[in-house]
Amino acid sequence: MTGRTQIFLGLLGAGLLGQGAASLVLDALGLANDHLPQRFANSDPLHASIHVIWGAAMIALVLTGLSDADATKLALIFGIFYTGLAIAGLTFHHPLGMRLDRGENVFHLLVGPASLAVGLASGLRLRERPA
């Protein structure tokens, strides 16, 4: 069954994969910079690779028929990870050597809690289902 949580994860995964891959390509070609539209592509290869890995994993899991319970867990795990990344980016200058600046921190502050909210709502829906 493909529910709302799987759709959210699939779309989020596609966005992360696309953004991360574009970042890596622009960086490899020496075209990454702080001007739009390239600014949406982070020139930090480690950070871009994290987006690619999360995006590819989300897409693969959704396409293999991720159950509602597992989709809930994935949304919560991703939400915790990205909310933590946002907090680290706000607390430390370039945590773990990643260039996390204002734009990246804002993105992580949006997508992390949003994923937590989706995961929590999905978990509540699962608990309310008749056995």
Segment roles from a protein language model:
Residues 1-131:
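Membrane-interface extramembranous regions
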